[in-house]
Amino acid sequence: MTKKIALLLLPFILISCNGLGPKRVKNIVELTPKLAIQTHEPIYLDSNANIYAFNANMLKNKQYSFARSKTITEPVFIGDMIYALDIRSNISAFSIEKNKIIWSYNLSRHKKDNYIGGGILHHNGKLYVTYGSRLLVVLDAKSGYEIIRKELPDIIRIKPIVLNDNTVLVQTISNQTIALNAETLKTVWEHESLAEVLSASYFMTPIVQYDNVIVTYNSGQILALNITNGEVKWNFEFTNLNDRTAIPNFDESSILCTPVHDNMNLYIATGLGKLIKLNVATGSVIWQVNAEDIQSMSLIGNSLFVTNNARQIAAFNPETGKVKFVADLNDGQDPKKLKSAAFLVPFVGVNNNNKRSLNVISVNGVLYSFDVDNNGLNMIPHVVKIIKNIRYYGLSANNNLYFSTDSKIIFGSK
């Protein structure tokens, strides 16, 4: 009898022992290594990139419904029209002036299916559309009439791009890059790398740089391909980075967010916990620094701004890779109580008094604005509650600032 009682009490005895029993699990904000200031250098927000006439009250303007269902890609603005692609593979043309959908066309023959990824390219009066299937569909932009479609070897999760007036480019999830004639969709050239079993969580839209197009593969490669014939000019592999080895099929071999570039350099955040600067002419590494779980990046003035899963915004010196500014995006809360948040690309806003601020939008519905004064960029932001689920922002065809969720759009001047 005594033995039976002892056995029944054993689990409770073990739980009460030091080191056993329930423990609080750290959240991703706590687990992400924080960036720290390494050098004290001035920050100038004086470039033309990512600077907009902006104030927080814009986000209270009227919201317009511009698509049939929830959108899955960034809207495209051409004149008065907004072209949007939704989760049901409907592409819609929305007139800003008339405040209504002018035409809508379903790209799939399986209307009940949900699709992920893809995008819209407007080129020479046509829309080249991918929607997370194997198909590239070309429509007349004015009428929505289907002109031609082509089935590719595998699913396409990124938008097509223009290589030149006669050629468009698509890339599949199985590491196939295919240049197509813009009229006939016949293959001009193609390049293929080793296909991986699992796909990366983020797919980078190829970047045209002079005579080359820069592409990435989920095997951990970045390549510069000649836009005329697809020849490889240079090839960089994440396995060349120090300290850790990229593992195919996992996030370590992936790119975490949209890279940024200037005329000579490409800045990339990798799943290896590295932020790297590449020379676009040669593919050589100029510098690499430790920076975990970067969400978004922006080149503004003399700084490379990044946000990360630790809910920080930081400024790197683009020349050296050293951190010169760090601030928290935490609403003043205890980090242990913070939930993860997704942050859009930082941008600079200029208000009616011509004063500038650095702004970060959280998809959770929070705007963080850092003022600039005589002492530089403030480390404590103004925190403003805004509408949730803003996914994109930018300039419309008439240079009007817009913000879009997965179903609504807001214009800055409306």
Swiss-Prot record:
Gene3D superfamilies: YVTN repeat-like/Quinoprotein amine dehydrogenase
Pfam families linked to this entry: PQQ_2
SUPFAM superfamilies in alphabetical order: Quinoprotein alcohol dehydrogenase-like
InterPro entries cross-referenced by the UniProt entry: PQQ_b-propeller_rpt (IPR018391), PQQ_rpt_dom (IPR002372), Quinoprotein_ADH-like_sf (IPR011047), WD40/YVTN_repeat-like_dom_sf (IPR015943)
Stored SMART domains: PQQ
Name of the protein this chain belongs to: Uncharacterized protein RC0314
